[in-house]
Amino acid sequence: MHRTNEPRPPASRLRIGSAPDSWGVWFPDDPHQVGWDRFLDEVAEAGYTWIELGPYGYLPTDPARLRDETARRGLSVSAGTVFTGLHRGEAVWEETWAHVAKVAELTREAGAGYLVAIPAFWRDDKTGEVLEDRELTPAAWRDLSRLTERLAHRVREEYGLRTVVHPHADTHVDTEEHVVRLLDTTDPDLVELCLDTGHYAYCGGDSVRLIETYGRRLGYLHLKQVDPEVLARVRAQDLPFGPAVAQGVMCEPPLGVPALEPVLAAARPLGVDLFAIVEQDMYPCPPDRPLPVARRTRALLESYLDG
């Protein structure tokens, strides 16, 4: 019997932000990308107050300078990002940890609380060269789950950060089957989910259903959409992710899928503070394109939250 006087869990406090990705930034240094100072100026001008670090080395890596550059623009950092290949087992652990520790230290010094961990690509995201089998063996899945837990535990103990795993196109954690498998084989107290709505839709997943089923594992959101027509061409041609992005597979909301208002509505009742970071993959893109898109997207998301 339902008791009407039972207290309801508080609604999640959704903190909207953006990231270098939405300015066409994929690499620490690339002639096709805008400079880091322009990114910081424009993300603040677009009305965001939260950002991610993006690829290590794009923003200043000196903690004092990074804090100064972000603070004087009214910006705060929510997370850093690492790519990992933990399915390869113990042989890659030390090398992986050396990279993770470097990023985690800067992330902590920037005042952020999250480390976004993206699994390694099975094919090169620029050239399409196949690097590994598309499917992991049972042994590789065991290594992935076990070492992801070890990574999350060590990151928490040494840097005080929460690790959120980011399913990503052209990695071994992409489809609903693979995402659920990782969640079901890892400790929920250690390993949380960074749900990227665009990547999940790209790989055939339903973000709302995932939130409704695994909401207690949701630690972080990346908001983006895919263009269904472009995605159909990408799938028909089996294009790698990089060329797909160059063709515009990730599009400006609300022009694609999934609809973001139901995603936010599904996340709000979870009763946790949650970052919702806009990440519209646009590499490469004209330098004057990101700012107007960022303004419109922020206004759209704010309208969903105010509604």
Locate each region found by the language model.
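Short, flexible, mixed-charge acidic loops at enzyme active sites
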Residues: 30-34, 121-129, 230-243
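Active-site acidic/histidine proton-transfer and metal-coordination neighborhood
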Residues: 2-8, 92-193, 289
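Non-cysteine beta-strand/loop elements that form the S-adenosyl-L-methionine
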Residues: 17-19, 78-80, 115-120, 216-227, ...
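N-terminal pre-domain/capping segments
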Residues: 2-112, 138, 142, 149-150, ...
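Acidic-and-aromatic substrate-binding clefts and catalytic sites of carbohydrate-active enzymes
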Residues: 27-32, 50-65, 85-96, 169-175, ...
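C-terminal/domain-terminus segments
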Residues: 274-304
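A short, acidic, amphipathic alpha-helical segment used as a generic capping/interface helix at domain edges
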Residues: 254-270
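Acidic/histidine-rich catalytic cores of soluble enzymes
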Residues: 18, 50-51, 145-257, 306
